[in-house]
Amino acid sequence: MRTNYQQESFVEGCFNRIFKGLSFKGIGLELARVKEIVEVERIENYKLPLLLFLLEDDTLLHIEIMNDEIKPDFQSMSVYDMSIVLKYGMQVRTVILNFGSKQNSNFQRSFGSVYYNTQIVDLSGLDGERVYEELSQKIGSGCLLDGRDKLKLVFLPFMKNSLPFNEVLPKVMSLIEKIKDEEERMAYVAVISEIISRSTGDQGVKVLKECLMDTEVGIRIRDEGKKEGMRDSLLIILLHKFDSLPDYINHAIMNQQNESILMDWLIKA
């Protein structure tokens, strides 16, 4: 398990900028504040946790999201949670943020003598269009976003909306472009991009790629990623979400060759 006592990657830095010190009390979770984002080692054949935070009380918070299109992988969730408990002896609390139809308050499953319980936080009452208007007014007036506003902005693409996802996401990205602080803008785009790439299928990644290519902050994210090396860039993280990569692209990534090879392939993909 990795925390920031090692050199944090570009994406980890963006997550920490948005979430560090954040409280989840605004959505009904009585937990300690976020200390930092945590990355765990990948377990073959199982989907990585969407979000894993180290809290100030030295417990871990594992967050997944669901709506009417996105369903959590409960098997992968339980495998990673139990692996962390057994390997590191840390307490893990797992929460699913539900933006779809109203769901039960928890998910329970037993594995022999092990009892696995996941809390579902029902956020189905959040209207994405209303939330968009509220955030648009705050951002437009230059107001600082509080903790609850930050959570709303990060998860805005997944809320109920009369528009399809491929129309909602560009609106969210355009809203973020209005944030005055450049580093803040970049952090939000990076965080939302990573969440989308981890939680949606190829269609979501395709929409995301189009949004990133067309925005100033998306280009900045790509350039910042290049400074760290190709394997740490957001662009590479997104590319790993494709079903497969040509052998010469895999070779270019592993050997950190000229990024133009990768960019040419991405443009044609």
Model-identified regions with their sequence ranges:
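Short capping loops/turns at secondary-structure boundaries
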Residues: 114, 158-165
